[in-house]
Curated annotation (Swiss-Prot):
It comes from Influenza A virus (strain A/Tokyo/3/1967 H2N2). A motif (Nuclear export signal) lies at residues 12-21, 85-94. Its main location: virion. It is found in: Virion; Host nucleus. This is Nuclear export protein. Mediates the nuclear export of encapsidated genomic RNAs (ribonucleoproteins, RNPs). Acts as an adapter between viral RNPs complexes and the nuclear export machinery of the cell. Possesses no intrinsic RNA-binding activity, but includes a C-terminal M1-binding domain. This domain is believed to allow recognition of RNPs bound to the protein M1. It comes from the Viruses. Pfam families: Flu_NS2. HAMAP family: INFV_NEP.
Length: 121
């Protein structure tokens, strides 16, 4: 994985974990958990692409990997909408910057997962 992407994930997760958004802290914790899950999934797809022979083991291990891929794209879309919503309602510039960077990272990760998945198909 690109070292910039790693540091972007780590930076955004750290900053999001420091935010306190009132009664919506559970929602924020859910977003953080989904970001972490998305990062792990992206990493595993990237590793499978790097070892192209693993496509068969990936398919054997999880015969529903295409379905899982679709679910990940749904999660990304949900996160994008949630981050956009947070961006609209927050007035704190630190939070605005964090959510703008999170949104940019989500778009990048979505594109990377699409690229990896096309290579695996």
């Amino acid at each position: 994985m690109d070292s910039n992407t790693v540091s972007s994930f780590q930076d955004i997760l750290l900053r999001m974990s420091k935010m306190r958004l009132g009664s919506s802290s559970e929602d924020l914790n859910g977003m953080i958990t989904q970001f972490e899950s998305l990062k792990l999934y992206r990493d595993s797809l990237g590793e499978a692409v790097m070892r192209m022979g693993d496509i068969h083991s990936l398919q054997n291990r999880n015969s529903k990997w295409r379905e899982q891929l679709g679910q990940k794209f749904e999660e990304i879309r949900w996160l994008i909408e949630e981050v956009r919503h947070r961006l609209k309602i927050t007035e704190n510039s630190f939070e605005q910057i964090t959510f703008m960077q999170a949104l940019q990272l989500l778009f990048e990760v979505e594109q990377e997962i699409r690229t990896f998945s096309f290579q695996l198909i």
